[in-house]
Design a protein with these regions (language model features):
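Catalytic-core regions of hydrolytic enzymes
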Residues: 16-146
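Bacterial N-terminal signal peptides
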Residues: 1-11
């Protein structure tokens, strides 16, 4: 979040996709939602934190970068399938897709601090596949996940 605040606070906004001459499209995905709570703490659920962060990020972009088109995969506590999230990004020809997730830690452990950013590269395709399988195991909650 700080990186976005610094970049947009300095007035450095992308406004047009140079290759297509159309507005830059940012899709913000609030991870989990609806029947998929994500990590559950004593007082919070990941889906709620993700939604609040995604909406705050979107507002920050909208207020500081009026030429950036912001699209959300969800603005309320609803379940959106993984395919549905991809469809939203693809249908809108997203230039950037940001999926917001938060971590949890076991009770009694020191509270983690900081941020993590994950990107997939082709240099470790086998490892990436295992991560993708683990992260996408939520797909079994979808009614038609065997398709």
């Amino acid at each position: 979040m700080l990186l976005f605040a610094v970049v947009w606070g300095s007035g450095a906004c992308l406004s047009v996709n140079a290759a297509t001459k159309r507005p830059f499209v940012l899709v913000i995905d609030a991870g989990h939602g609806g029947k998929d709570a994500g990590a559950v703490g004593q007082l919070t659920k990941e889906k709620d934190i993700n939604l609040n962060v995604a909406l705050a990020l979107g507002r920050l972009v909208e207020q500081n970068c009026p030429n950036v088109k912001v699209i959300y995969t969800r603005k309320t506590d609803v379940f959106v399938t993984l395919q549905g999230r991809a469809d939203i990004a693809n249908r809108n020809k997203a230039d950037l897709f940001i999926s917001v997730h938060t971590n949890s830690s076991p009770v009694g452990k020191a509270a983690p601090m900081g941020a993590e950013t994950y990107t997939l590269g082709m240099h470790r395709a086998a490892d990436n596949l295992e991560v993708a399988k683990r992260e996408n195991s939520v797909i079994t909650q979808e009614s038609n996940y065997k398709q």
